[in-house]
From Swiss-Prot:
Gene, per the UniProt record: dpm2
Alphabetic keyword roster: Endoplasmic reticulum, Membrane, Transmembrane, Transmembrane helix
Disulphide bond pairs: none
Residues spanning the membrane: 2-22, 38-58
Subcellular locations according to the entry: Endoplasmic reticulum membrane
GO terms, molecular function: enzyme activator activity; enzyme regulator activity
Subunit record text: Composed of three subunits; dpm1, dpm2 and dpm3.
Membrane topology: Multi-pass membrane protein
Role summary: Regulates the biosynthesis of dolichol phosphate-mannose. Essential for the ER localization and stable expression of dpm1.
Organism: Schizosaccharomyces pombe (strain 972 / ATCC 24843) (Fission yeast)
GO terms of biological process kind: dolichol phosphate mannose biosynthetic process; GPI anchor biosynthetic process
Name used for this protein in its record: Dolichol phosphate-mannose biosynthesis regulatory protein
């Protein structure tokens, strides 16, 4: 299931970024995609959120590890 969602998201984004800039603005297929500014904003926001999650996870592991060492 997740493979299909990932593939669909990849294809949508690829078409949106690589093909749609060359399609005429009056074409009906332009209505299927968001504005071009979102093509950069969405991936950057997802990447920042992922970096924050990874940083939080690593920080919690380091805090847990230091508590175990201090208890010994």
């Amino acid at each position: 299931m997740i493979v299909y969602i990932s593939t669909a998201a990849f294809l949508y984004y690829t078409i949106w970024v690589l093909i749609m800039p060359f399609v005429d603005n009056m074409n009906i297929s332009q209505k299927l995609f968001l504005d071009r500014e979102w093509a950069i904003t969405i991936p950057v926001a997802v990447m920042l959120f992922g970096i924050c999650l990874i940083g939080t996870f690593v920080s919690l592991l380091m805090i847990k590890s230091s508590k175990k060492k201090s208890d010994l």
